[in-house]
Amino acid sequence: MICDFLIDWRRYVPHRHASEFCQAIEFLRKFTPNSENGKHVLLENLVYANVQSYCPRDLAQGVVEYHREFVDLQTVLAGEEDIYYVPTAGLTEIKAYDAAGDCGLYAFDAKEAVHCHLVPGNFVIFFPEEGHMPCIEHAANPGEVKKVVLKLHRSLFE
């Protein structure tokens, strides 16, 4: 997991795929709070973005997700949310990994969870197999969130 500010994205450019990663960041920068929700493809099967609007959940309703094929780079365009990194060893699986959706789910266990507060201007990266629980309301501002999840195929980091 990486949590940082968008102005510092250059620290994380994978050397072998710098061109694709830089294209992905430029793609990400084009999204605004007025961007249309849905899937936006930059490089077929390598880089796409899911833009979504929602009201974050209460912590008690959260579930831990993980992926095997895609890295998540998550940032909010409007609003704020809490997001957690959660080691998956020892967690209870509640939905087996589905290759078609590149997602599996575990029950949340706060014992080893690492918290990150997501606001416009910062981002978090979750690598394949890293458990994460997004979309959790921030107590100070539980309002609607507009978010981009940039999906980067794992091969870009190999």
Residue ranges of predicted features:
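A short, N-terminal "cap"/entry segment at the start of jelly-roll beta-barrel domains
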Residues: M1-V51, V63
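A short beta-loop-beta micro-motif enriched in histidine and acidic residues
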Residues: L43-E44, A60-V71, A89-D98, K111, ...
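Structural motif
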Residues: L46, F70, E80-D82, N122, ...
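Conserved short histidine dyad/triad with adjacent acidic residue
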Residues: A49-H67, L77-T92, P128
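Short, conserved beta-strand element in jelly-roll/cupin
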Residues: E69-E81, P87, A96-A107, K151-L152
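A short secondary-structure junction signal
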Residues: Y85-P87, C135-H138
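Conserved metal-binding segment of the jelly-roll/cupin
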Residues: H117-E137
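A short hydrophobic beta-strand segment most commonly corresponding to one strand
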Residues: F123-I125, N141-E158
